Regions:
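Acidic, metal-coordinating helix/loop segments flanking the phosphotransfer/catalytic sites
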Residues: 34-50, 60
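Output/docking surface of receiver
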Residues: 86-126
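Conserved phosphotransfer cores of two-component systems
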Residues: 44-46, 72-79
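Two-component/phosphorelay signaling modules centered on CheY-like receiver
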Residues: 11-32
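Conserved phosphotransfer microenvironments
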Residues: 50-75, 86-89
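Conserved acidic carboxylate
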Residues: 7-8
Length: 127
């Protein structure tokens, strides 16, 4: 069974993603980080194939902090793909910066928070 770790401020959306995977035919287990401090430890323990992190305009979810966390995760789990999620309606500049991070090869994928959980699940599976 493949694993993903989700580190999101929006618990409702994280729960929706976890429920979507649980009720799907995909053989993927979702591990939710309760706090940002848990993320590194969970990645080290479970060695997920994808880490999904939400990015907002507020600490500790700012892009710079997420990219520092990405560096730490990649040092421990070099095969883990990094995906960032942002609300492109309220965080327009952050969304642009995340697109640039993808273009520059700093992350593997990005998602907008406005997409349905089922679509997000399909995109994660395809990674």
């Amino acid at each position: 069974m493949r694993k993903i770790v989700i580190d999101m401020q929006n618990y409702l959306f994280a729960d929706a993603v976890a429920a979507a995977f649980k009720s799907s035919d995909y053989d993927i287990e979702v591990i939710r980080a309760e706090s940002q401090r848990d993320t590194v430890e969970l990645c080290q323990i479970y060695e997920p194939f994808v880490l999904v992190m939400e990015v907002t305009g507020y600490a500790p979810w700012k892009l710079g902090e997420r990219l520092r966390l990405r560096d730490e995760i990649k040092a421990l789990c070099p095969n883990c793909k990094i995906a960032l999620m942002v609300d492109s309606n309220t965080e327009r500049q952050t969304a642009k910066d995340i697109r640039d991070a993808k273009k520059d090869g700093l992350i593997d994928q990005f998602f907008y928070g406005s997409m349905p959980a089922e679509y997000l699940m399909d995109q994660i599976y395809a990674m």
